[in-house]
Amino acid sequence: MNVLVINCGSSSLKYQLIDSETESVLAKGLCERIGIDGALTHQPAGKDKIKSTPAMPDHKTAIGIVIDQLTDKENGVVESLDEIGAVGHRIVHGGEKFTKSCLITDEVIKEVEECSVFAPLHNPAGLIGVRACQELMPGLPMVAVFDTAFHQTMPEKAFLYGIPRKYYDEDGCLLYTSDAADE
């Protein structure tokens, strides 16, 4: 099965199309400057990078451009969306609610929104990507993959080490180490 992996930032979108059986990357790319002037780098496996500057006023447009690149007659790697079995979305913060990846439902979206207080730059952007993919690829399973899930498998003494207990008891704060630590 081919899986489209999406990592949305506030003005960027990284993607890979992966054959899950062989674990090979069929194509990868980056949409940058979404909402500004747009820049795309697309690289099918074994081919040179293709760079262009299509208008990308929003993430939905950017994801549409990614789909067009993946299905392009000359530089695409699949003939249609029918060859994609699922979409995986990087979600930075799932709080204590998510200990592993999960299918995205309305309830999952609501809970990720609630966790956005802990990742205000990343979670809203991730959800924009989820909603855009749901619109453009209806019926495809969407999966949330949480950066914080690893931390939910740690013993309490490890994730509370270094912070006063009251921060956890009153606000749900935990000690996480990741690239989102600046938030």
Task: Indicate residue ranges for each PLM-predicted region.
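Conserved active-site "lid/cap" helical segment
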Residues: D37-G85, G129
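Short glycine-rich, Thr/Ser-proximal phosphate-binding strand/loop in the N-terminal lobe
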Residues: S12-M56
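Conserved small/polar residues in nucleotide/adenosyl-binding loops
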Residues: Y176-E183
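A structural motif corresponding to the C-terminal end of an alpha-helix
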Residues: G129-M142
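Short beta-strand-loop/turn "lid" adjacent to the catalytic site in phosphate-handling enzymes
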Residues: G76-H122, V143, F150-L160
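Extreme N-terminal starter segment of soluble prokaryotic enzymes
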Residues: M1-V3
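Acidic, His- and aromatic-enriched active-site or binding-groove loops in soluble protein domains
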Residues: K166-L174
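Residue-level signal for inorganic ion chemistry
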Residues: N7, C31, V87, D147
